[in-house]
């Protein structure tokens, strides 16, 4: 990747003024005004729905199961086990009904309500589209209902209909049965479960005063509330780096200073992890190990994941995934679109020399609960395909960095400034 003029100028600022000068950060501090507007009643309803297993086909999993406060709004697993499994995080256990791991690492929820976020999911398959009837582009296509208020609300509708996430296997319940007919047939089934509960009906009336009777409730009322909850509860803009950006007295260690200079300099981290969210929201191939079943395209004969290409159908997007935010990394391991690395050191070393890291991947880095022999075979089948491995290598968008171990340690020290432990403690207390 080439260093742009603005990037070169930011390096000069660091060299001239020193990395301890707060106004050297090439982004403005986040404020409440940078987030989409939500209502307290909707947030309260969304909080309860977020933890509600009735939204799943077999009444045994909720949004919170895979986006848990104890695991930094993810699940602590490389690839999760969805509907039918038991337990939370790394203790989650498969049973005989689990036919497939969730093909991608559960993404974190921090700052999804920031107005600059215009696409969601690892491949960006949910985005704004003013030409679409609903105003959004999504896998539900024109079956997505009108009235959804945010990208996060749109996102909330989709796991409910996904077999390996929340809907369940064919023949197990009425939700997956409806999905098999048409995706929008499933949402009313879920809504019926919620409006049958008098307490939920009271909360819905409080949130949406225009509702006169239960039959008027549809999936948008539930999804908008879940979206408002996520967009509000997981705002992260009070980490030490934010205090530093605001010019507050925030002494840095020598390692953090050196790591900051590397982040915005030699290591070129900010070429992709830019701005206050530490993501340019673009898509790049890092050549991560082809672990797991992958989110295969409809007619793909291989168990693989081509990433953004599955949405764009552009060959140049093969194996490219959205740049994640770096906020709260200490709480959100493992790392990568398939959680291939259990440690920050591991994922940074992959950036340091992607091809070498791919060829010498240490499978013990993966955090995968024990499952059937079939699932465990699929976890590593991609490594057996030499042509697939070569395609992944040829897709890589980043150049080797040649960082020393000391420099990697310094970058990790800098990244600690992006953690907000008080926020994590609060959302754990409020779950």
Model-found features: residue ranges?
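Bacterial N-terminal signal peptides that target proteins for export
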Residues: 1-9
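N-terminal signal peptide c-region/cleavage motif recognized by signal peptidases
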Residues: 16-19
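Periplasmic c-type cytochrome electron-transfer domains
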Residues: 22-431
């Amino acid at each position: 990747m080439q260093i742009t003029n603005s990037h070169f100028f930011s390096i000069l600022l660091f060299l001239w003024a020193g990395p301890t000068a707060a106004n050297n950060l090439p982004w403005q501090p986040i404020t409440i005004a940078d987030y989409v507007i939500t209502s307290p009643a909707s947030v309260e309803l969304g909080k309860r729905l977020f933890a509600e297993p009735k939204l799943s086909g077999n009444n045994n999993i909720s949004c919170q199961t895979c986006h848990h406060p104890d695991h930094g709004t993810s699940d602590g697993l490389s690839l999760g086990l969805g509907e039918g499994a038991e337990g939370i995080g790394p203790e989650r256990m498969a049973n005989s009904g689990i036919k497939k791991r969730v093909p991608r690492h559960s993404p974190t929820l921090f700052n999804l309500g920031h107005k600059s976020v215009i696409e969601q999911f690892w491949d960006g398959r949910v985005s704004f589209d003013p030409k679409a009837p609903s105003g959004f582009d999504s896998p539900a296509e024109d079956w997505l209902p009108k009235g959804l208020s945010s990208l996060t609300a749109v996102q909330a509708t989709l796991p409910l209909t996904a077999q390996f996430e929340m809907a369940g296997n064919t023949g197990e319940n009425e939700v997956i049965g409806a999905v098999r007919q048409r995706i929008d047939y499933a949402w009313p089934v879920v809504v019926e479960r919620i409006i049958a509960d008098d307490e939920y009906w009271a909360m819905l009336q409080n949130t949406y005063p225009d509702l006169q009777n239960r039959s008027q409730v549809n999936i948008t009322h539930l999804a908008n509330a879940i979206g408002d909850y996520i967009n509000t509860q997981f705002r992260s803009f009070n980490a030490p780096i934010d205090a530093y950006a605001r010019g507050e007295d925030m002494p840095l260690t020598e390692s953090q200073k050196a790591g900051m200079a590397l982040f915005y300099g030699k290591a070129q981290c900010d070429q992709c992890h830019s701005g206050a969210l530490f993501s340019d929201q673009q898509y790049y191939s890092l050549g991560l190990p082809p672990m797991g079943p992958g989110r295969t395209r409809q007619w793909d004969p291989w168990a693989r994941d081509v990433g953004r290409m599955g949405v764009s159908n552009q060959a140049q997007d093969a194996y490219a995934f959205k740049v994640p935010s770096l906020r709260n990394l200490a709480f959100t391991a493992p790392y990568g679109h398939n959680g291939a690395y259990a440690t920050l050191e591991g994922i940074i070393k992959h950036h340091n020399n992607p091809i070498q890291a791919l060829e010498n991947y240490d499978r013990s880095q993966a955090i995968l609960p024990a499952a059937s022999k079939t699932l465990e075979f699929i976890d590593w089948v991609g490594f057996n395909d030499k042509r697939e491995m070569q395609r992944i290598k040829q897709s890589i968008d980043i150049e080797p960095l040649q960082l020393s171990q000391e420099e990697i340690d310094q970058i990790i020290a800098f990244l600690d400034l992006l953690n907000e432990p008080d926020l994590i403690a609060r959302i754990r207390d409020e779950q």
